[in-house]
Amino acid sequence: MAVTMIALYKEPADREKFEQHYFDTHIPLVKKIPGLQKVEVSRFTGKDAPYYLMATLYFNSKEERKAGLSSPEGQATNADLVNFATPDSVTIAFTEIV
């Protein structure tokens, strides 16, 4: 069963700085995660949106997701979060595609 990891980011204090690091550094790291099938980044719209960006990472199975996120590439991606986000500004969720 296909699964995802979703990262929801709150509005950053400095959009330009956030986006520069996110798209130039973080997403290239994400794309190196073993087993990753696809990554999509969406920007929320509307003035009352609860989040700023959402990243959806797709994997073929829970096992591939776990292995990918536990890999050195997955750990490097996780370690990079502190370079553009605070712990309270990102929410992580895991889903199964139905």
Regions found by a protein language model. Give the residues of each.
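Macromolecular interaction modules
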Residues: 1-98
